[in-house]
Regions:
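Conserved redox-active cysteine motifs that mediate thiol-disulfide chemistry
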Residues: 485-502
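N-proximal helix/coil linker or "cap" segments that precede and/or mark the start of modular domains
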Residues: 445-460, 477, 529
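Hydrophobic beta-strand anchors of alpha/beta hydrolase catalytic cores
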Residues: 482-483, 515
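A short beta-strand-turn-helix
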Residues: 461-481, 552
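Active-site region of glycoside hydrolase catalytic domains
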Residues: 2-56, 60-61, 103-105, 113-372, ...
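Thiol/disulfide oxidoreductase modules built on the thioredoxin-like
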Residues: 532-537, 543-591
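Catalytic domains of carbohydrate-active enzymes, especially glycoside hydrolases
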Residues: 76-97, 300
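Conserved segment of the thioredoxin-like fold in thiol-based oxidoreductases
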Residues: 495, 504-546
Length: 594
């Protein structure tokens, strides 16, 4: 790493963040956590923490706030689902409160289980997909008293709980996260001491991190082995906060930035990717982690991203580094800068795992609501840029649906798309939330009529050939696929098709390239006569209702277009009409894939 290594910052004066497009099947959602919104969660580790004092006999929570009734989401979830509908989102990420479900060891509350079943069913009834987090910073008091994840043997209790909740919600929840942000849980609870259990013990922090990651692996394989386990996606949610040198010329700043990035981000990612890693900070902790089963313990990875921090190194053993803000940065109420470029960086970092990515949290605290519109536009632009660069992102969840109890910050931080008056529980949509709503509901065609974009995963469908043979597009993974949308009444198609025959079909048909013509809105006999008239031999498929066409483009748009899909199922090139330069560029794109 060099002192001249460029800082990733974009010139926003030259960028139009509204000029973006997301795939039609992209998941849009909001997120909450049980303790922050449900209310009356008084049997978990955070309840104890809120009512305790620090070493100076001061409240551990800003303004001595208590979660208390919170946003009363437990009783008001039906109304909150209506708010989600108003936003236009189709996914909702929330956590189940372990302490409600298993208030005593081995004793399960049927009423609590039924509540979560009814919540999931009501979401589905409103065409909103439930996304469940099993552990979002809280667990029962009895588990805390046993030592929680400080002891390896305690993981069996969390695995047992996970099995129970899976069996209860099976068939209702297709996407599951085991843990929310283990790195934050460890950093705040065992390094900084501002989350429960309030310890400052780097060695114990390494143990807890290892035990949580191993518990994730156990839960993944356990749930996958159960009936119905093969139908769900299971992942873990990883927070990334980049640590960048405050002074790019300073060796200490670089060194401590690297150490922090390694222990906070790279170590757990390497464990999940390779099954082994090291939790290491010089002079503080050096814990080797190994579990071969971790290598295949993810169907997806969740990314929570907010910002970055600048690190200043010091020649001081008591305080070897501190965090500093730059004067030019626009700051959120949480004290970190607006840094959309970091979302792009984080997506590239986490893509090393080779699994689909969901941005499971992204948002800001902004009491004035003045920064929120710019924040949303820029971060969604960064997300779209990652998609264009072929990073496999499947969805985005804004944090949060509504204002909530923000852990050690209490009720001071206003993250919600909806403002909450905690005296009356009235929810009011913030004006600054509009860019998010507009993007969620924007997903129509682009200027050329396409509903998909380069970098998207190609929508799957059944190909029905004129020969009567059928196969699914997904089954063609491993080959380059060129879809040519056509129709007998399309004069441009008739001109283009002989060129496709010569330049693609005859040249590459035995080299791993599938050229498939998709004829829209016409019966078999018309399609067969059409193929005979133009003199082509590459296979044609039937699309009588233009349903396949409608997966890729607005049905009211022109038919002449080609879609090039790589061996992994990603769209890499799109054409419209038959323009010579674009056509040659398409041929070059196909050749580059071979």
């Amino acid at each position: 790493m060099s002192f001249s290594y460029p800082d990733t910052e974009w010139d926003w004066e030259t960028i139009d963040p509204s000029d973006i497009h997301f795939p039609r099947d992209f998941a849009w959602g909001t997120a909450t956590a049980a303790h922050q919104v449900e209310g009356n969660n008084d049997n978990n580790n955070w309840h104890l923490w809120e009512y305790s004092k620090d070493e100076n006999n001061l409240s551990r929570i800003h303004n001595s706030d208590k979660s208390g009734l919170a946003a009363d989401h437990w009783n008001r979830y039906s109304d909150d689902i209506k708010l989600m509908k108003d936003l236009g989102v189709d996914h909702y990420r929330f956590s189940v409160e372990w302490s409600r479900i298993e208030p005593q060891l081995g004793v399960y509350d049927s009423t609590a289980l039924q509540h979560y079943k009814e919540l999931c069913q009501e979401l589905l009834d409103n065409n909103i997909t439930p996304v469940v987090t099993l552990h979002h910073f809280t667990h029962p008091i009895w588990f805390e008293k046993l030592g929680a994840f400080e002891k390896e043997e305690n993981s069996k209790y969390f695995v047992a709980f996970s099995k129970i909740i899976f069996e209860e919600l099976k068939g209702l929840v297709p996407i599951w996260s085991t843990f929310n942000e283990p790195s934050v849980f460890v950093a705040q609870g065992y390094f900084n001491g501002i989350f429960p259990p309030g310890k400052k013990d780097p060695i114990l922090a390494g143990t807890v991190m290892e035990n949580m990651l191993n518990a994730h692996v156990q839960i993944y394989h356990k749930l996958k082995s159960l009936p119905g386990g093969d139908t769900i996606k299971i992942g873990i949610v990883k927070n990334i906060f980049q640590f960048d040198p405050y002074r790019r010329w300073n060796l200490l700043d670089w060194a401590f930035s690297k150490f922090l990035n390694d222990v906070y981000t790279n170590s757990p990612l390497k464990f999940l990717k390779d099954g082994q890693s090291s939790f290491y900070l010089p002079g503080m902790v050096d814990n080797d982690m190994s579990n071969p089963k971790a290598v295949r313990s993810l169907d997806f990875i969740g990314l929570n991203y907010y910002s970055r921090m600048h690190v200043k190194g010091h020649l001081n053993s008591r305080e070897p580094f501190t965090f500093a803000n730059r004067e030019q940065d626009v700051m959120t109420d949480m004290g970190y800068p607006v840094y959309a470029e970091g979302l792009y960086r984080a997506l590239k970092t986490i893509s090393i795992l080779g699994v689909p990515i969901y941005v499971t949290e992204n948002g800001l605290a902004d009491d004035t609501d003045e920064i929120r519109p710019t924040f949303i536009k820029r971060y969604l632009y960064a997300l779209n840029r990652a998609l264009r660069d072929r990073i496999d992102v499947r969805g985005y969840f804004y944090w949060s649906l509504m204002d909530n109890f923000e852990w050690a910050e209490g009720y001071k931080m206003k993250f919600g798309l909806y403002d909450v008056d905690f005296e009356t529980q009235k929810r009011v949509l913030r004006e600054g939330s509009m860019p998010f709503i507009e993007m969620v509901n924007k997903q129509g065609a682009d200027k050329r009529g396409y509903l998909v974009d380069i970098g998207d995963m190609a929508p799957d469908f059944t190909i029905r050939y004129t020969s009567g043979k059928e196969e699914r597009l997904h089954d063609l993974r491993g080959e380059v696929v060129v879809l040519q949308f056509t129709a007998s009444w399309c004069s441009v198609c008739r001109i283009e098709m002989p060129h496709l025959e010569k330049d693609i079909w005859e040249k590459y048909k035995d080299k791993g390239v599938r050229l498939i013509g998709v004829d829209r809105d016409e019966p078999l006999e018309t399609v067969l006569q059409f193929q005979k008239d133009v003199g082509t031999t590459y296979p044609l498929a039937l699309d009588p209702g233009a349903d396949i066409f409608g997966l890729f483009a607005d049905k009211n748009s022109g038919v002449t277009r080609n879609v090039v899909i790589d061996r992994d199922g990603k769209i890499v090139f799109l054409t419209r009409l038959f323009e010579e330069k674009e056509y040659q560029d398409m041929l070059a794109s196909i050749a580059s894939l071979l």
